[in-house]
A protein has these predicted regions:
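Glycine-rich phosphate-binding loop signature in dinucleotide/nucleotide-binding domains
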Residues: 25-30, 111, 142-144
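Active-site-proximal beta-strand elements of phosphoester/diester hydrolases
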Residues: 4-12, 113-120, 165
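Core catalytic region of metal-dependent phosphoesterases/phosphodiesterases
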Residues: 2-101
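Short acidic-hydrophobic surface loop/beta-edge motif
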Residues: 107-112, 159-161
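Active-site-proximal segments of metal-dependent phosphoesterases and phosphodiesterases across multiple
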Residues: 78-84, 114-144
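Conserved beta-sheet core of the metallophosphoesterase superfamily
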Residues: 130-165
Length: 165
């Protein structure tokens, strides 16, 4: 039997949802896990979500914008006030090891025969969005595998160009 991957993403510290997804993955015979970022942010359980993703996905995780801002003491000017409050709250909840782990995640990475990125491949640290064919087209040139998984949009999307997804 071959490898079967579950691609996790935009968990946003929602332990109840993550638990349900993991239970469903187990019934589907998933053997490996990856995460396209944003493990933390918005919800109440950042610590346990980080620890579970670390346990299951290991190095097959990339940094999301919420992971980035919650792992460091960067200025939050320009953030929506409620979003800034959530970042501050999450920063206080995480221990040093969790902050360091989040802050050291890569922006993109290759796993086996596919790529992971949270935002865009052309400038992943700028947290741009891929919502349409034009934005996807700009990223295909940076894709080094036939398949790339991304998060950030909270919308299930797929784009294809000459056999590259």
């Amino acid at each position: 039997m071959g490898l079967k991957y579950a691609i996790l993403g935009d968990i946003h510290a929602n332990w109840e949802a993550l638990s349900a997804v993991l239970a469903a993955a187990q019934t589907q015979g998933v053997t490996n896990y990856c995460c396209v970022g944003d493990i933390v942010g918005y919800n109440a359980d950042p610590e346990i979500c980080i620890e579970k993703v670390r346990e299951l996905a290991g190095d097959a995780v990339v940094r999301g914008n919420h992971d980035h801002y919650c792992s460091r003491q960067e200025n939050l000017n320009g953030f929506h006030p409620l979003a800034a409050d959530v970042v501050d709250w999450t920063r206080k909840r995480l221990n040093e090891d969790q902050r360091n782990w989040l802050g050291n995640l890569r922006y993109s990475r290759t796993v086996e025969t596919f790529m992971l990125v949270h935002a865009t491949l052309d400038n992943p640290e700028m947290w741009g969005y891929v919502f349409d064919k034009l934005e996807a087209e700009a990223n295909f040139a940076y894709q080094m595998c036939s398949v790339c998984f991304f998060g950030h949009t909270h919308v299930p999307l797929a784009f294809e160009k000459a056999g590259i997804v």
